[in-house]
Amino acid sequence: EKYRKTTFKPKSIWDDNSFLTETGTIELRELGFEKQFDFPKPISLIKQCVELSTSDGDIVLDSFAGSGTTGHAVLKLNKETGVERKFIIVEMEEYAKTLTSERVRRAIKGVPKSSNFKDALGGSFSYFELGPTIEMESILQGKNLPSYEEFARYIFYTATGEEFNEKKINEKTGFI
């Protein structure tokens, strides 16, 4: 009973015009992207979803990031509310580098020529590409052996959870 008094119950139907995909298309254009993506979700829609379902310190996962609206919405919401949410966005298509990550960069830095996105939202992000799969069974059988650097990166990350810097390999000893 006590939780009913402290929680907000959203409307069942969201009919705000700012939630239309047309708005998402206009936003992408203002960010400097021509028609590269059909029916992108608008920032306001994703921002509303994130605001209703997360709080300070939460991590938002979007496994099908598309044009990167989720990352953009989280950055905008963080700036507006002063709350620190993080996000992980995943995109497997070719436009991940040219659209998805570039949109997040522009949101962070701002777009000087845009009237709505001139101001930088701040924040940071890391962009990663998947490398070839390292399967332990194949390694144990001596098949498809990765290079020393690839294997060192895998072992180092598995052991520490940190990114591996190949420059730290001692060429003479092979030690990290």
Model-derived features with residue positions:
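Short acidic (Asp/Glu) and glycine-rich catalytic loops that position anionic groups and cofactors
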Residues: T23-L28, G82-I88, S126-I134
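Class I S-adenosyl-L-methionine
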Residues: E1-I59, K86
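Generic alpha-helical structural element
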Residues: Y3, K35, I89, E93-A96, ...
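Phosphate/oxyanion-binding active-site loops and adjacent basic polyanion-contact surfaces
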Residues: F37-P42, A96, S147, F151
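Conserved S-adenosyl-L-methionine
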Residues: I43-S115
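SAM-dependent methyltransferase catalytic region
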Residues: V104-I176
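A generic structural signal for short, solvent-exposed coil/turn residues
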Residues: K5-T6, K79-T81, D119
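Residues that form or immediately flank small-molecule/cofactor binding pockets and catalytic motifs
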Residues: S18-F19, M92, P132
